[in-house]
Amino acid sequence: MSGLWAQVVTQYGTFKVEIIGSLAIQVLFWWVPSAGFVLLDRLAPSFAAKHKIQPAPKQPTSSEIFDAVLISFRNQLIITGLQVTPAILSTRSSAFQITPSLPSTKDFILHFLICLIAREILFYYAHRLLHLPYLYRRIHKIHHKFTAPVSFASQYAHPVEHIVANTIPIVLPPVLLQTHILTMWAFVSWQLIETATVHSGYDFFGGAAYRHDRHHERFNVHFGGMPWLDRLHGTDEIEGLVKKHN
């Protein structure tokens, strides 16, 4: 593994490794799972119906899902542009460590956990901010078009929201830590799978999707990806979760 990674970095250089690797992560851990969740209705209709959180009449139409795909693709192009431009204009090759050596196990675990906690804090308060009436009407309302969300809706957002709430909370912690790119990719992969899952509309993985589904349905509960800040601020709707899973 270490020999293969060293060969890739040496042969292709830091710029190509970062950009191509980051795009591959998006495809493998967001586009593929999101498509899988959306196609579940056709591939396993009885199973899908059993696990759908909201009833069929509330589900988005095919044209709405296609619109979510287009907007998500646009948002990813914007982020890729923001990632590529500084790398081209700056003399510094990358904000992350891209070295022939692998990250140590200690650094990998420590940076991953710090990024996980920091992302949750940044996302929760950015999300709460976007629910202020002025910002909600002008920016965040677009994302809430999907009152019964699907995975592709996780990146269906105003460009400002996609940068401030979806991207910065994930990217800023590893940038500040100067994390190894492999640790960064592992963290981003986790976040992409999580957001595809919680927007899937299915009751998988211990109620995570149910919490965010209720946020899209009610707007004023379950702002976080994890429940602990919602519990701290009284936005967790604990009674609803208990009834749902008992």
From Swiss-Prot:
Pfam families: FA_hydroxylase. Keywords: Endoplasmic reticulum, Lipid biosynthesis, Lipid metabolism, Membrane, NAD, Oxidoreductase, Steroid biosynthesis, Steroid metabolism, Sterol biosynthesis, Sterol metabolism, Transmembrane, Transmembrane helix. The chain crosses the membrane at residues 19-39. A motif (Histidine box-1) lies at residues 127-131. InterPro entries: Fatty_acid_hydroxylase, Sterol_Desaturase_Related. Signal peptide: none annotated. It is an enzyme of class 1 (oxidoreductase). GO terms for biological process: sterol biosynthetic process. Its EC number is 1.14.18.-. A motif (Histidine box-3) lies at residues 210-216. Heterotetramer of ERG25, ERG26, ERG27 and ERG28. ERG28 acts as a scaffold to tether ERG27 and other 4,4-demethylation-related enzymes, forming a demethylation enzyme complex, in the endoplasmic reticulum. In Fusarium, the biosynthesis pathway of the sterol precursors leading to the prevalent sterol ergosterol differs from yeast. The ringsystem of lanosterol in S.cerevisiae is firstly demethylised in three enzymatic steps leading to the intermediate zymosterol and secondly a methyl group is added to zymosterol by the sterol 24-C-methyltransferase to form fecosterol. In Fusarium, lanosterol is firstly transmethylated by the sterol 24-C-methyltransferase leading to the intermediate eburicol and secondly demethylated in three steps to form fecosterol. This is C-4 methylsterol oxidase ERG25. It comes from Gibberella zeae (strain ATCC MYA-4620 / CBS 123657 / FGSC 9075 / NRRL 31084 / PH-1) (Wheat head blight fungus).
